[in-house]
């Protein structure tokens, strides 16, 4: 069976976009292997850290990703997105070069092995969340950093995007994310893409149920993505 990786653009446990992804999973799970990318522990990208990760991987392959690292919160950068989810900028990423080197290796391998990627993302300030930008900054780096023209794990990889948010239906976010994905040479399915405007009840109880029309849109995107994967 072909393998699709789901990427959730929010770290919130009960994220609306995680709920949306679970509906999409139910539409595809009988025909595809579905896995979720865990990149919560991925640090902010910088080339010094990249070099230390590469060096540590060359010297040892026994490092492990620490899930228990404490989270430090920044009161100065906290704000909520249009869909009510806390922006990634309000939560410090764990800065553990060797442990995160292991995370990066696992993340890259999962992306390399999959047949396609489906992103589910909220919209933050008319754009995509910083944690997604950081993820794709890492993934767009050459696998061999000594050769800048070397292939990346995402180059040519098929991908599509959906999002649940406010009245804008994540349209601005998806447009800008599509642009980024094309720039890093991914094969982007831009039509159709599902954008969900969350109803009043979702903001009240933290859950939402797709309308028949929204479910139909998601089904159409799922089927077109199946065709797109070939």
Segment roles from a protein language model:
Residues 2-29:
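N-terminal beta1-alpha1 ligand-phosphate binding loop
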Residues 39-53, 93-97, 202-205:
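N-terminal beta-loop-helix "entrance" segment that forms/cooperates
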Residues 46, 187-230:
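Glycine-rich phosphate/pyrophosphate-binding loop and the adjoining helix
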Residues 94, 99-184:
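Helix-loop-strand module that forms the ligand-binding subsite of alpha/beta enzymes
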């Amino acid at each position: 069976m072909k393998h699709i990786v789901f990427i959730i653009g929010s770290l919130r446990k009960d994220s609306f976009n995680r709920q949306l992804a679970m509906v999409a999973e139910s539409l595809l799970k009988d025909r595809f292997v579905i896995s979720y990318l865990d990149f919560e522990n991925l640090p902010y990208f910088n080339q010094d850290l990249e070099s230390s990760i590469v060096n540590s991987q060359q010297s040892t392959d026994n490092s492990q990703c620490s899930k228990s690292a404490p989270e430090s919160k920044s009161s100065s950068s906290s704000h909520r997105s249009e869909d009510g989810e806390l922006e990634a900028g309000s939560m410090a990423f764990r800065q553990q070069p060797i442990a995160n080197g292991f995370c990066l290796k696992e993340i890259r391998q999962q992306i390399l092995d999959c047949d396609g990627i489906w992103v589910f993302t909220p919209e933050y300030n008319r754009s995509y969340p910083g944690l997604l930008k950081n993820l794709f900054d890492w993934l767009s780096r050459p696998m061999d950093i000594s050769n800048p023209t070397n292939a990346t794990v995402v180059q040519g990889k098929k991908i599509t995007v959906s999002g649940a948010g406010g009245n804008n239906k994540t349209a601005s976010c998806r447009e800008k994310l599509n642009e980024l994905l094309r720039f890093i040479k991914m094969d982007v399915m831009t039509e159709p893409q599902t954008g969900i405007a969350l109803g009043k009840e979702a903001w009240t109880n933290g859950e939402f149920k797709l309308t028949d029309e929204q479910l139909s849109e998601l089904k159409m995107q799922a089927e077109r993505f199946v065709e797109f994967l070939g």
